[in-house]
């Protein structure tokens, strides 16, 4: 009887053991699935919230609804601060007199003319007036087969859209990212129906302008390889639902935009050639490596990465690492503001190099700081202090990023382009507009001159 109890006890223990083993295996499998799902979620979240996420996109930046209602922040200067008025214009187009009534509107007292003083103020106004021009056009069918048509400097030789209207269409399209339908409605509204062109007609007008500007666009592209340096950046750009990329380059004289179906090195090679004699100011995207004579890597990206990790791990010495980099960057930026001589630049570069190496060679950084050192500071060693030595360039790529930001509105509002031709037209026209602004000119007036000539 006793033997049977022992066997039964062993059997129960074996059953219990198998139950707990199966339960552990099931829990281990569930844990593995949860951890795997967590990693996928973290990877997906990191695509939207990382060191390159603009501050305007951070969800924790915005206050709650209750806090927003309690603490409104109106635009402009705070009440009681010094006013800021425009200076008097150099010329005026019209002069008017604002006259007083015979009596005070409040108490009815008679106002004597000899007691009245005057003052000047300036009012800025604008009108959009439709101008319909009747053109009496001479023509002559020559015996040689040529059909000769008379010309006028203020009138396009073909079409019904004048030069000013074409330039306005372009400004509304590119400056405000307006749809062709909205541009058509806008002109129909402000001109009381006198100017009413279909969206297709406006689209065709933009295409003709791009075609006219294409030779000078190609000329700017050919000039890039002869420039001493170029700021470079790229961003995603949908074309017919496919992922293309908008590349933007800023040099001393030009801004150049190209939209390609590639983010690879070949785009740079096609523009600058295999051995570019100048320098590239960019982020640490690897396609920029080993094709230019010198580089300046972007300190804004470096500091943003360090700050992101410091906020993520506030108890680690990544915080100290970020503070050291920020202090060094501020010191270098202040030095460049003084417009130093070449000799002083060479001397200070050695000093700043020692300070950067001291940060790099510190042995007790946490793994997050070491990761930045290994993958950023050491990999691109020699590319962080070029701006100290070479005059005219900055420590970061913010100059180019501010230019490329002008195209983001188009991408967000219009979703990129539906055709390759539309993408090419955008690159051509926007290259000229940004180049004119870069040169201190007004894009509307410059485009008007190009169309007339």
Task: For the regions a language model picked out, list residue spans one by one.
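Catalytic center-proximal scaffold of phosphoryl-transfer enzymes
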Residues: 2-11, 21-22, 28-32, 139-141, ...
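Short, flexible loop/hinge motifs at secondary-structure junctions
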Residues: 1-157, 232
């Amino acid at each position: 009887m006793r033997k049977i109890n022992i066997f039964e006890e062993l059997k129960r223990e074996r059953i219990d053991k198998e139950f707990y083993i199966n339960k552990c295996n099931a829990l281990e499998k569930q844990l593995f699935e949860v951890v795997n799902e967590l990693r996928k979620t973290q990877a997906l979240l990191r695509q939207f919230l990382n060191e390159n996420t603009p501050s305007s996109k951070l969800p924790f930046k915005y206050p709650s609804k209750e806090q927003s209602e309690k603490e409104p922040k109106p635009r402009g200067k705070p009440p009681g601060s010094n006013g800021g008025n425009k200076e008097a214009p150099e010329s005026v187009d019209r002069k008017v007199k604002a006259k007083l009534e015979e009596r005070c509107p409040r108490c009815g007292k008679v106002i004597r003319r000899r007691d009245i003083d005057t003052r000047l103020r300036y009012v800025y106004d604008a009108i959009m007036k439709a101008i319909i021009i009747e053109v009496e056009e001479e023509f002559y069918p020559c015996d040689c087969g040529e059909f000769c048509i008379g010309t006028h400097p203020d009138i396009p030789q073909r079409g019904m859209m004048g030069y000013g209207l074409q330039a306005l269409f372009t400004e509304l399209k590119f400056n405000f990212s307006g749809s062709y339908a909205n541009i058509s409605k806008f002109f129909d509204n402000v001109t009381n129906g006198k100017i009413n062109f279909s969206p297709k007609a406006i689209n065709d007008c933009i295409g003709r302008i791009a075609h006219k500007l294409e030779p000078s666009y190609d000329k700017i592209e050919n000039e890039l390889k002869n420039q001493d340096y170029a700021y470079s950046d790229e961003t995603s750009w949908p074309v017919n639902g496919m992922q293309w990329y908008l590349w933007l380059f800023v040099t001393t004289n030009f801004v150049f935009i190209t939209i390609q179906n590639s983010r690879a090195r070949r785009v740079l090679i096609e523009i600058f050639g295999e051995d570019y004699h100048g320098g590239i100011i960019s982020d640490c995207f690897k396609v920029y490596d080993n094709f230019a004579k010198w580089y300046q890597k972007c300190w804004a990206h470096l500091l943003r990465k360090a700050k992101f990790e410091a906020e993520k791990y506030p108890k680690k010495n990544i915080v100290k690492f970020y503070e050291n980099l920020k202090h060094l960057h501020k010191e270098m930026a202040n030095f460049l503001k003084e417009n130093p001589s070449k000799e002083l630049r060479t001397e200070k570069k050695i000093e700043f190099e020692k300070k950067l190496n001291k940060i790099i060679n510190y042995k007790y950084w946490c793994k997050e700081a070491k990761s930045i050192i290994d993958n950023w500071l050491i990999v691109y060693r020699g590319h962080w202090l070029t701006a100290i030595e070479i005059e005219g360039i900055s420590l970061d790529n913010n100059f180019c990023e501010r230019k490329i930001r002008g195209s983001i509105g188009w991408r967000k509002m219009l979703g990129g382009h539906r055709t390759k031709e539309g993408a090419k037209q955008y690159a051509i026209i926007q290259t000229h507009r940004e180049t004119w602004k870069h040169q201190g000119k007004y894009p509307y007036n410059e485009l008007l001159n190009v169309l007339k000539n």
